[in-house]
Amino acid sequence: PRNDSKGIPTETEYVLAYGKNPEWTPKKLPRTEEMDAKYGNPDNDVMPWTSDNPCAPGAKTHQGMVYAIQHPFTGEMLYPAISSCWRYEQKTMLVYMCGWCEYELKNLKDEAQRAKICGIDANEVRKDIKGIVLKNGLEESKAHAQAVLKRGQWPRFYFTRNGNGGIRRKTYLENVEGKMVTNFWPYTEVGHTDEAKKELKALFDGEIPFDTPKPTRLLQRIIQIATN
């Protein structure tokens, strides 16, 4: 804004977007170095990853994905957060957990706990859902899990705090998409009015043939997210 502006100067402009299809979704932008910097490789995995939520919403409608997973280091029974379920179906989670030590399915008669997570009455919860529990004793299971922890390249679902913390999920950099388009485009990315005026002056021998020109970078952004 100008130094002699009155009141509170405006620093935003609005671009109206129209589409024939109400289900239209803009294309994602290229990822930034800052976004990719959040991905690392603390366990010497084959590709960089970041720590992610092991759960997903929808416990009430996905009762088959709400159950206990026994911690291989502490023996604690872990459940999804209230109203949440595990990210993947049980047979997939069982495969991931067997990457730490041997596991099996067992009926824990934990209907009350699962009903609480799902937000339903205990008599409404499914009775056939088993927990993923250690197949062998805790000491044997823990020793195997500690060997995996020391070896590196941990399974997709891992345990924080050197094995003593909660469960988390790896999200690999190669599997994530670009940057989501929002309704705020900073001038550092798409330019500003002064930049647009300078571009016009360069094209029209110092003249600005029309008011409120738009910078080339803004037009490029619009084309980038809306076309192939």
Regions found by a protein language model. Give the residues of each.
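Class I S-adenosyl-L-methionine
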Residues: 1-227
